[in-house]
Amino acid sequence: VIEARSEVGGTASSETFSGVTVNICNCDHLTFRTTGVSEDLDLAKHGLKYLDVDPTQLATSWSDRRIWPHFRDVDKTLDVIKHFFKDEVDGYRAYLRDAMPIAEMIIDAASQPPTRRSLISKVISRRGRGVTTMLRWSKLSSAQVLRKYFKSELLIGPALVTGPTVWGVSPHTPGTGLGALTYAMRHVSKVGRPIGGSGMVPISLRR
């Protein structure tokens, strides 16, 4: 593991700010749990253990009093959408049809060192499912992608907040389209929070 900063752990590491210790990016962990890094470094032996988080997200807005949960289970999430956004159910299903193959392919590819041979073999094994959509989305902005499926800002906003906005770029920036995978990724992988907080990642790395 190579770190450019003096503190290990990337955005999970802690800094002193206004007299308190905070994570640079206080977030639940999803992608990190799919890469195999924790297992390769045996971080559980050094204190990194997770609690699975479900619902994976609670969303609301400044102007709307509705608070709606997003679950890992697709059917439970569709039930929520039926309750809060009746005219968005078909759009969410269409989104998942396009997004899930991409998310599954990315997670699969991240599970081992990416070589040209391994990536090609994964695409072939999936019969190319998701490749065309992935290439098309990658040229668009995240906002453009999500607006192809959803009308309500209450559905679009939470996906953008945990996507490109976290990266520090506008969701209207061309080339951020794969940031629209937020919801799909939460169905494909387990969202978790380290026991002891996000800072347990750098602590376990130091140990």
What is each of the regions a protein language model found here?
Residues 63-174:
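Rossmann-like flavin
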Residues 17-20, 166-168, 189-192:
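A short glycine/serine-rich beta->alpha loop
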Residues 137, 180-207:
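Helical element adjacent to the flavin cofactor pocket in flavoenzyme catalytic cores
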Residues 2-5, 175-181:
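Active-site-adjacent bridging/hinge elements
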Residues 32, 141, 200:
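Short, conserved clusters of charged catalytic residues that mark active-site
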Residues 42, 169-173, 186-191:
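Short helix-capping/linker segments at secondary-structure and domain boundaries
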Residues 1-107:
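N-terminal glycine-rich phosphate/pyrophosphate-binding loop and immediately adjacent elements
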